[in-house]
């Protein structure tokens, strides 16, 4: 039996067609903002409406509204910490998870605007959709390192990498080792699923959607991230 949590196994949300490719990168700029934060993620970061699985939002899956997903809660908490507005960019990179073995090809095809954003802080919150069988034959760590290098185009960028929201040891060890080697900040969030309140169980009929972070879970992710952002 595969060594992953039951919630990871329950995630039957497809890794493909999570968002219209023309919307993979979205930049939000605010008057007077200086700091630029880039979020690189998957459905937990943003997923377009998909009524066939009971999802009607266009933000981090299972959050009740855009303001409650971890991206927007992170920005809000960071603005409170700084006392000023924050610009941010969202790169929905499930495409990388599916095609990581292709190197820069998917990155150059879809994510150049996020690279050229030259963020001050790059948050890598991704991994749940990496095919574990493929990863056994072709470990994703090298591709992860190249992906981070691609997005962290600002030489002074601070990089934050998290483990998986659902416990997937096979991937977590690679992410943590890469962070340690390159001096990235590694933030653990994988323990959050031990608290059922962090997931949207009972709020959606589709088990995969319901396994995604609830508003409370999104807040906890945001708090962990902001705790490690030194300003």
Residue spans for each PLM region:
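N-terminal secretory targeting modules
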Residues: 1-40, 44-63, 76, 80-85, ...
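Alpha-helical structural signal in soluble globular domains
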Residues: 73-81, 146, 150, 154, ...
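Conserved beta-strand segments of alpha/beta enzyme cores
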Residues: 87-89, 158, 183-185
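Active-site segments of SGNH/GDSL-like serine hydrolases
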Residues: 123-132, 145-177
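Charged helix-capping and loop-helix junction motifs
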Residues: 105-106, 137-146
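Catalytic His-Asp segment of secreted/periplasmic serine-dependent ester chemistry enzymes
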Residues: 165-231
């Amino acid at each position: 039996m595969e060594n992953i949590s039951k919630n990871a196994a329950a995630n039957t949300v497809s890794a493909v067609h999570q968002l219209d490719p023309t919307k993979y990168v979205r930049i939000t700029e605010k008057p007077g903002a200086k700091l630029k934060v880039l979020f690189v993620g998957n459905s937990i970061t943003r997923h377009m409406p998909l009524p066939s699985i009971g999802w009607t939002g266009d933000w981090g899956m299972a959050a009740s509204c855009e303001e409650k997903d971890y991206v927007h809660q992170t920005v809000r908490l960071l603005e409170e910490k700084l006392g000023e507005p924050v610009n941010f960019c969202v790169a929905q990179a499930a495409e990388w998870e599916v095609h990581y073995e292709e190197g820069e090809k998917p990155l150059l095809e879809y994510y150049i605007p996020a690279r050229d954003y030259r963020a001050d802080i790059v948050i890598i919150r991704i991994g749940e959709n990496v095919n574990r069988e493929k990863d056994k034959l072709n470990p994703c760590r090298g591709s992860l390192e190249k992906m981070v290098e691609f997005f962290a185009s600002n030489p002074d960028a601070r990089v934050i990498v998290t483990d998986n929201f659902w416990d997937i040891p096979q991937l977590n060890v690679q992410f943590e080792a890469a962070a340690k080697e390159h001096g990235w900040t590694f933030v653990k969030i994988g323990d959050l699923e031990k608290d059922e309140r962090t997931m949207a169980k009972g709020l959606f009929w589709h088990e995969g959607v319901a396994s995604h972070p609830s508003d409370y879970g999104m807040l906890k992710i945001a708090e962990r991230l902001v705790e490690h952002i030194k300003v």
